[in-house]
């Protein structure tokens, strides 16, 4: 679960977020560009630190904790797949910062790759992949971290509608299987509404609407 009440002194627009998200809830985060959607996710993940207030994740205070210490995994629009590495190596970075995996870690990589539909690509270099395949690799790496809170910041916006729908269905299945708490920034809410059970709308650094679906 997520519970926060924080301020963030952004240069052009001071922000104040108050939000509670139950365990396993799937929340869409919508709003105009620059409204503060990504900042909200960055505060939860620890990439931005709150000016004041508190962030509780699964009832533990992580307000000023390091990114790596938080029970959160996050995927951005830019997939950050390393082109010179294989798919297996890219996914394995979720487990170890080096390129040598133990047999047990290799099995974990194969399992998540199978769930993402990219098992046959494990030995292929990332620079030989399509955009949709790269995003599947990035999503697999994110999910392999096995954190209870999943944050997605417009991860599929660069893909065509068919590829977006495929990956959104994968996210829905994984979230249900693992009972993950999901916050996802999206500009294609009408296409992805079935993925969520709640939507929040952000304007000028504040949540101005909150609706169950």
Curated annotation (Swiss-Prot):
Keyword list, A-Z: ATP-binding, Cell inner membrane, Cell membrane, Membrane, Nucleotide-binding, Translocase, Transport
InterPro entries in the cross-refs: AAA+_ATPase (IPR003593), ABC_SmlMolc_Importer (IPR050093), ABC_transporter-like_ATP-bd (IPR003439), ABC_transporter-like_CS (IPR017871), P-loop_NTPase (IPR027417), Thiamine_ABC_ThiQ (IPR005968)
One MF term in the entry's GO annotations: ATP hydrolysis activity
GO cellular component terms, semicolon-separated: plasma membrane
EC number: 7.6.2.15
Subcellular compartments: Cell inner membrane
Membrane topology classification: Peripheral membrane protein
Catalyses which reaction(s): thiamine(out) + ATP + H2O = thiamine(in) + ADP + phosphate + H(+)
Pfam families attached to this UniProt entry: ABC_tran
Stretches assigned to the ABC transporter domain: 1-212
Binding positions for ATP per the UniProt entry: 31-38
Domain of life: Bacteria
UniProt function note: Part of the ABC transporter complex ThiBPQ involved in thiamine import. Responsible for energy coupling to the transport system.
Similarity comment: Belongs to the ABC transporter superfamily. Thiamine importer (TC 3.A.1.19.1) family.
Assembly notes: The complex is composed of two ATP-binding proteins (ThiQ), two transmembrane proteins (ThiP) and a solute-binding protein (ThiB).
Protein name as it appears in the record: Thiamine import ATP-binding protein ThiQ
Species name: Haemophilus ducreyi (strain 35000HP / ATCC 700724)
Name of encoding gene: thiQ
């Amino acid at each position: 679960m997520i519970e926060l009440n924080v301020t963030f002194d952004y240069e052009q627009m001071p922000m104040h977020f108050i939000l509670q998200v139950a365990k396993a809830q799937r929340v869409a985060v919508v709003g105009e560009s620059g409204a503060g959607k990504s900042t909200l996710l960055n505060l939860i993940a620890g990439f931005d630190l709150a000016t004041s207030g508190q962030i509780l994740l699964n009832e533990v205070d992580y307000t000023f904790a390091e990114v790596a210490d938080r029970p959160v995994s996050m995927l951005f629009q830019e997939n950050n797949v390393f082109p010179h590495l294989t798919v297996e190596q890219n996914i394995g970075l979720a487990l170890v910062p080096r390129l040598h995996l133990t047999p047990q870690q290799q099995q974990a990589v194969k399992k998540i790759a199978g769930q993402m539909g990219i098992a046959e690509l494990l030995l292929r270099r990332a620079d030989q992949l399509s955009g949709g395949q790269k995003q599947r690799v990035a999503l697999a790496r994110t999910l392999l971290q096995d954190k209870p809170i999943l944050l997605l910041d417009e991860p599929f916006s660069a893909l065509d509608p068919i590829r977006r729908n495929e990956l959104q269905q994968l996210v829905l299945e994984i979230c249900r299987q693992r009972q993950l708490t999901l916050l996802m920034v999206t500009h294609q809410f009408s296409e992805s509404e079935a993925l969520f059970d709640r939507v929040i709308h952000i304007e000028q650094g504040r949540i101005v609407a909150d609706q169950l679906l």
